[in-house]
Structure formats: structure tokens, C-alpha cells
A protein has these predicted regions:
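N-terminal leader/linker segments that initiate helical-solenoid repeat arrays
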Residues: 21-71, 220
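Structural register within alpha-helical repeat arrays
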Residues: 39, 69-72, 105, 135, ...
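Residue-level signature for tetratricopeptide repeat
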Residues: 42, 71, 75, 108, ...
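Alpha-helical adaptor scaffolds
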Residues: 72-74, 89-90, 102-107, 282-293, ...
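Post-signal peptide N-terminal segment of secreted/secretory-pathway proteins
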Residues: 51-150
Length: 377
């Protein structure tokens, strides 16, 4: 029995030793791999590609090996076959730098003008704007025009500059006769709203000759928003001219709110604005008159404008202003002006209850506060 016990203990001791040695070897192995990984990166940076090629196969089990593979693929992307890129993406779907590889390779296939190969590689729309433009151009090049023009329109309608790769798609769309001139007007409006004067000027200059009058007026307005009254009086009133005038008006209000306030009646007359369009201008000015430095006339005008407004955020801003100045009467007035949905917010429930307590309506105040507490659980 004692002999058997001694044998068991020897076996256990041997097992522990083997495990310790194994772990030490594994630790050494990881240290060596880490060292070789650093060697490869340095050799790569120094363009010592023979060293890179010799050491890379020894790191296939190292956790960071996919990063080396990614660099190997992208350093020579123009010569990579589709299957290599596809296999890498499928094998490393969560690798952070690999997430943009699909879009990069779509652009590479576009450079090769391999339109069918591009669509086979990326059956779905890629992520980046440049790749999307190449994707929809490939649709056009392979006869799928309806999809191509739908994609072109989606990419066109932005106030931002688009990548050069989009020029081919937009050019094909324009040449097909399928691009509505109104899409120019809509993009000009978006560019104007984004403050992209250069794009406004470029787009206006590309418009058909029968749009020359409005094109010239738009360029002048983009370069000098303060000329908005001249623009409003010299162009026929359309939805487009009204929208452009509103965007320019917002710019005027930022620089000179009083000038903008006094300008509203003239813009209303020149562009035949309805009540909703007029209120949009009032709202723009009212937002700019929330400080303590306004005149009595401006304050009365502002409150009248807010009283007519359908903008919940503007009315809420006025409530906060009343709170900030300790204006209890104003607080009551503007809380009452909030739509029912906004009144149910915890913030406004509290102040409604506070006002009820002040007026001696304790039960109503408790109901409001208890509802607020219950809704917060």
C-alpha cells in the first residue's frame, strides 16, 4: 500500500514538472513571437522585404499575425487577386483595419475598370462614399441603369463636396438626360445651408443655359447673404427662392439680429410668404433674442413670435429663460404654452407642481409630483 502511494506521488510530481516546463516553453515561445513580430515591423519599415518574407511564416499562430497579413495585402493592393482579399475579409470579420478593406478594394477594382468583378466582389452597397460612387457606376456600366440613377441621386443630394470618384457617376447621370434640373436646385440649397459657398458657385455655374438668371442670382447671394432682400425682389417667388432666402436670412440674423428682425415684412412681401414660412423667419430671430441685452421692443416682439410658434424647443428655451430670471409669472405663461407631450416631461412636471403649491393647490401639486416619482421607477 505504501509503495503504491509513493508511486502515485511520484507521478503527480512528474506531471506538475511537465506542466511547469510546458508553460515556461509556451511563455518563451510567446516572447520569441513577440520579438519576431517587432523584427518584422521594423524590417518592413526599412523596406527589408527578404527578412519580412522569411520571418512571416513563423508567426502564423501569433494572435497579431492578421495585422501583418493586412499590411501585406494593402501594400500591394493593385496586384492582389479578388480571392485573396475575399478570403482575408471572411477570415477576419472583426479585425478593425479590415473593416475598410472591402471599400478600398472596390475602389481598386474600379481603377482596373473591372465592373463585373466589382459587383461580384461587393453585391451590396459598400460603406464609404467613394466606394458607393464606384459601385453605382459599375451598375451603370453593366446595364443596370435604374439602380445606378437611384444611387446617383442619393449621393448627389448633399451640401458637402463629394469625392472625385463620384464625377464619373454624376457625369453619366447628366449625360443620360435623367438628371432633373431641380436636383441641381436642391443640392444648391443644401450647399447654401451648409455654408459651402464654393460648391454653390460651382453647381450654379453648371446649370442649363435657361437657368442663367437664377444661377447668377444664387451665386451673388452665396457670396453675400446680406444681399438677401435684393435677391428676394429680383427673382420670381418659387419654393426654391423662398428656401434660399430663408437660409441667407439665418446668416444675416447671426451677424445682425435687429437688421434681420426689421427685414421680415419686406421678405414676406417680396417672396409672397405664407404664415408658416413667415413664422420660420420669426423663429430664427427669436432664438437670437434670448439674452439680457435686448430692448423692451425686441423682448415684446420675441415673446409675440414665440407665442405664435409651433417649435417646442423654442418654447422650452423661453421657459428656461423665465426660470433663469426668476420670472414666476412668465414661467406659468410659457409652461402653459407647451404642448401636452412636452408638459409630461419630468423637468416640466416639477415646475408645474411647484407653481400649484405656490397657489395653494396642494393636492394637485402632490398628484403631479407623485406621478413624476412613479414614472421614474
Amino acid at each position: 500500500m505504501e509503495k503504491a502511494k509513493r508511486v502515485v506521488w511520484r507521478l503527480l510530481a512528474a506531471s506538475v514538472c511537465v506542466m511547469a516546463v510546458s508553460q515556461a516553453v509556451h511563455a518563451d515561445s510567446l516572447d520569441e513571437q513577440r520579438s519576431r513580430y517587432a523584427q518584422i515591423k521594423q524590417a518592413w519599415d526599412n523596406k527589408q522585404m527578404d527578412t519580412v518574407q522569411a520571418l512571416m511564416p513563423t508567426l502564423k499562430d501569433y494572435p497579431l499575425y492578421p495585422y501583418l497579413e493586412y499590411r501585406q495585402i494593402t501594400d500591394d493592393l493593385m496586384n492582389q487577386p479578388t480571392v485573396t482579399v475575399n478570403n482575408f475579409i471572411q477570415a477576419n470579420p472583426t479585425l478593425p483595419p479590415a473593416r475598410n478593406l472591402q471599400s478600398r478594394f472596390v475602389n481598386e477594382l474600379a481603377r482596373r475598370e473591372d465592373w463585373r468583378g466589382l459587383l461580384a466582389f461587393s453585391p451590396e452597397k459598400p460603406n464609404t462614399t467613394e466606394a458607393q460612387c464606384n459601385y453605382y457606376y459599375a451598375k451603370w456600366a453593366t446595364g443596370q441603369q435604374e439602380e445606378a440613377w437611384a444611387g446617383a441621386k442619393e449621393l448627389w443630394l448633399t451640401g458637402k463636396n463629394q469625392p472625385n470618384a463620384c464625377d464619373s457617376l454624376f457625369g453619366a447621370w447628366r449625360a443620360s438626360g435623367k438628371q432633373d434640373p431641380l436636383s441641381y436646385l436642391e443640392r444648391i440649397r443644401l450647399a447654401m445651408k451648409a455654408g459651402n459657398t464654393r460648391l454653390v458657385t460651382a453647381l450654379a455655374g453648371q446649370m442649363p443655359s435657361d437657368y442663367q438668371t437664377i444661377s447668377t442670382a444664387v451665386i451673388s447671394l452665396a457670396n453675400d447673404p446680406n444681399s438677401v432682400l435684393t435677391f428676394a425682389r429680383s427673382t420670381g417667388a418659387t419654393d426654391f427662392t423662398r428656401q434660399m432666402a430663408a437660409v441667407a436670412f439665418a446668416s444675416v440674423a447671426r451677424d445682425d439680429v435687429e437688421n434681420a428682425r426689421l427685414m421680415i415684412p419686406q421678405l414676406v412681401q417680396a417672396q409672397q410668404l405664407n404664415e408658416e414660412q413667415t413664422q420660420e423667419l420669426r423663429d430664427i430671430v427669436a432664438w437670437r433674442l434670448m439674452g439680457t441685452d435686448v430692448t423692451d421692443e425686441q423682448a415684446r416682439w420675441r415673446d409675440d413670435a414665440i407665442m405664435r410658434s409651433n417649435s417646442t424647443s423654442l418654447v422650452e428655451r423661453r421657459v428656461r429663460m423665465a426660470l433663469g430670471t426668476g420670472d414666476r409669472r412668465g414661467l406659468n405663461t410659457w409652461l402653459a404654452r407647451l404642448p401636452m407631450e412636452a408638459k409630461e416631461k419630468d423637468e416640466w412636471r416639477y415646475w408645474q407642481a411647484d407653481l400649484l403649491l405656490e397657489r395653494g393647490r396642494d393636492d394637485d401639486a402632490k398628484d403631479r409630483k407623485s406621478t413624476r416619482l412613479n414614472s421614474s421607477h
